[in-house]
Amino acid sequence: MSTTDETALVMGIETTDDRGGVVLCCGEEPLEQREFGPGASHARDLLPGIDAVVRAADIQKSELDVVAVAEGPGSFTGLRVGVTCAKMLGYTLGPAVVGIPTLEIKAYNVEPAEEGSGAHVCPVQDARRGWVYATVFRSTGERWKDLTGVLAGPPEDVAQEVPEGALVFGDGAEKFNDVFTPERFRTGDESLDDPTALWTARLGLRRVRAGGAVDPMELQPRYYRPTAPEENLQRRSAQKGN
């Protein structure tokens, strides 16, 4: 089946935060979905979740037209699990495969049309160890346009890149609310924080229709910073060199 068909079968996989989920869509409309609870073990829950939505929809995995996965930033372990699963499905079964930035998925928790053309939103994600990830998006009235790519660094530095009056939300904005203040920005509530498998699938289908599918073996998780052990090793190496 062509991915331009409104009945294209699309699977969305989201494993970048401590919840996550999987959805099966017909076009952009959800058929079946499974959401994992707080503290989910993605390595344990993802494959049974995929089997559950496929079985509930009475299809075979081989009928999938698109597999979309949240590619990061996010939980290092969750990213590896989700991306590896998407690669496996793409390589063995042949659907179009695409990775979607986690912050873009979060942006669509806010409707571009409701914000109005020209409005800005900025999901801010806690990156641990005193950093945040963020991306600034501008509404075209129909979609969110990425203006900055992923910004990664101390919250004070990242906040300088966000236009005043932008709607900021996410666990990073909440954690560093002394930086992302209501005096400078509009602040969203916790209902906007989590990326969803549904928007992963919808954006994945749109990306594939625009020619953005990738070779499954080239799909990679996007971490945007080293792990804590890697940072410690880099620090020790730098100290030895001085």
Roles of regions detected by a PLM:
Residues 2-71:
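N-terminal beta-alpha supersecondary unit
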Residues 3-8, 29, 41, 96-194, ...:
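Surface "functional belts" at beta-alpha junctions
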Residues 26-30, 83-93, 139-142:
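A glycine- and small-aliphatic-rich helix-loop capping segment at beta-alpha/alpha-beta transitions
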Residues 37-45, 76, 80, 84-87, ...:
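Residues at secondary-structure transition points
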Residues 55-62, 90-100, 115-116:
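Phosphate-handling active-site elements
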Residues 68-102:
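DPxDG-like acidic metal-binding loop motif
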Residues 188-242:
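Acyltransferase
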